[in-house]
Amino acid sequence: MSQETPASTTEAQIKNKRRISPFWLLPFIALMIASWLIWDSYQDRGNTVTIDFMSADGIVPGRTPVRYQGVEVGTVQDISLSDDLRKIEVKVSIKSDMKDALREETQFWLVTPKASLAGVSGLDALVGGNYIGMMPGKGKEQDHFVALDTQPKYRLDNGDLMIHLQAPDLGSLNSGSLVYFRKIPVGKVYDYAINPNKQGVVIDVLIERRFTDLVKKGSRFWNVSGVDANVSISGAKVKLESLAALVNGAIAFDSPEESKPAEAEDTFGLYEDLAHSQRGVIIKLELPSGAGLTADSTPLMYQGLEVGQLTKLDLNPGGKVTGEMTVDPSVVTLLRENTRIELRNPKLSLSDANLSALLTGKTFELVPGDGEPRKEFVVVPGEKALLHEPDVLTLTLTAPESYGIDAGQPLILHGVQVGQVIDRKLTSKGVTFTVAIEPQHRELVKGDSKFVVNSRVDVKVGLDGVEFLGASASEWINGGIRILPGDKGEMKASYPLYANLEKALENSLSDLPTTTVSLSAETLPDVQAGSVVLYRKFEVGEVITVRPRANAFDIDLHIKPEYRNLLTSNSVFWAEGGAKVQLNGSGLTVQASPLSRALKGAISFDNLSGASASQRKGDKRILYASETAARAVGGQITLHAFDAGKLAVGMPIRYLGIDIGQIQTLDLITARNEVQAKAVLYPEYVQTFARGGTRFSVVTPQISAAGVEHLDTILQPYINVEPGRGNPRRDFELQEATITDSRYLDGLSIIVEAPEAGSLGIGTPVLFRGLEVGTVTGMTLGTLSDRVMIAMRISKRYQHLVRNNSVFWLASGYSLDFGLTGGVVKTGTFNQFIRGGIAFATPPGTPLAPKAQEGKHFLLQESEPKEWREWGTALPK
């Protein structure tokens, strides 16, 4: 076997290859970026120009931009003063892509926000600050410019139409004032300047591109700035295009359809207003007068719209007034043979509160008619327009005065206007009115119809205030005449005109109210014309006149028709006093009349039964000086007294607390050594109290051991009455006292005979088993003066207790019974002990004794029967 020898080995060689390190790429990249930034900065830097400004307000280096058409094209770099310190040099960097725009005619100006009533201009400057506007121009390249004071007129051709208006002055127009076509804004005032010849101004108007076709060669422009007002005594004319026009001024125009379109830079005239633009049809007018009319002011109205205007007024020989009117072409077809033009005066009306009509004064109203076209018209006064209607009813009304009624005021029937006052004439006997009633309402007027003033506002000023008497608010503002429809009689040609409804119902044409009743008074009370007439304090009329005579005064009264039913044959009149004073135990009562009645006076009346026979003097009724005197008619009585110390004039006469009369006079009768009191009873009480048996007594305070009675009479005593049942009588004796307790006034009257009065007196109680059932009403001597007659009255509810065999005795309130074995003392109440009393009882008997009759006499025992407590007699009613 053979052995192989390994081959020899070759040693490897390592070689290093040289490469550029990637790290060295970073400086290269940085160099490239720096080069690009330098180039970009160079490109952005653009061109630097200098702009001279008179003021640099709001310009900030590095912040204030330069804009063209809203695009930022540069920035302010630096601001410095010129060498002569008269201007500001602003360094501006303009982008390189705008380099070609920097030429001789390029313009710069400062844009700042401006606020006014018209609005805010330069709003973008208000948000982002002031900026410099730029308008590229032509010419050689330039890097130094002078800024304009305002925005330049010239604009690039973007489709807007620039025209020029010539006017004598600028008026209230301003840059930005709107231009209207049929109330739509279509452009604005771009700029204005004074004419080169110094005569007037030139106004540059820019019309928006979409409205340029509205401007024609024959277009007329007029000023609608602010408020066009023409104020005079005859009225005021106020025109207002819009709020913007009021604040910043405005221009309006119209264009004929057949005219050619206007071209840029065309010139037009600017008129004062629409009337001066002479756009419309001219018609001639024959006017009733020129009063209240004003050329270029008074309008022609149709259905509430102004369709024309009076443009000329002429006074012709003979005083005839003519005029010319410019009418809107849209209503020319209405101007025909039977068309009327009416002249109307403005009127205040609550139903049609057209305040603008009140300010404009008189107006013309177009009333279309048929027939052939015409351009000359006779103007009809508005108040006579109704006469031109077919089948109109005309009537004549007569009145003593005009009552404020004038031509043009309405005729009202049931609140609806049915006619109009046509004319008013003054005559020697008064005023005559011609009225017209519409054809459809003429059948409503009858022979007994009445015409009443509807516009009258009667004002009465007095101490009680101001009183307005009139129709409703709308009716007295509109005025006119009210018709009261009748139902019978043929229609008449003439009717009277009444001042108010009351006079119409009375058929009275006098200014003074009619006399309803006349009064006569011996002396004049505190009344005068205008004093009120009252019925139970309610006003029902007034005093018309007061006429003096030799020995009396005649007073005429007017009672309103609705209250005349209160007057009867029993009506009694008296003069009202200023105040009534009543002083009694409850205090001082003062009943004062209202101040107006106290100063002007008043007359009252009431109906008193039985007063008709004595309250007339001839054909006149008597006016009494006071209510007391009036109510005393036919009720005089005479009271006889021996002392007047407790009496006084005016002292009331009362029954159960109610005044039924009073004392009028006190006289001393020396022949009889007595006092005679003349008193009156009110008529309604005469028949009841002026009778025999009636007792009158003075009630005054009574102070005794038993207590104080009638304390309420300390301040004002009065006369108490106890009615009788005898025949009519007018003379009475005034008693010292009578009963005032109403429990016993209609009770049973009996007489108890006693040897002496003892401690008894009027008012001493009558007792039954200790219970008060009656009272002593009086004491007199017997016919032979041998005993005392004690009058007693038992209450009606207890009169069945008194029988023919009843026994009466003195009840002093105590008894003493002493004997050898002792004594007994019996007492009653303290009041009984002080006042005493009369007791009675009925002994038993079969059959039971009958009831005592009126006037029955009994004997009064000195002491009580010993066995009376054992009687126990049953006494049925």
Swiss-Prot record:
Residues 1-19 are cytoplasmic. Changing residue 243 to N: Well folded and assembled into a hexameric structure, but loses its function. Changing residue 126 to N: Loss of activity. Residues 160-272 are annotated as: MCE/MlaD 2. Changing residue 355 to N: Well folded and assembled into a hexameric structure, but loses its function. It comes from the Bacteria. It is a single-pass membrane protein. Homohexamer. May interact with LetA in the inner membrane. May also interact with partners in the outer membrane. This is Lipophilic envelope-spanning tunnel protein B. It comes from Escherichia coli (strain K12).
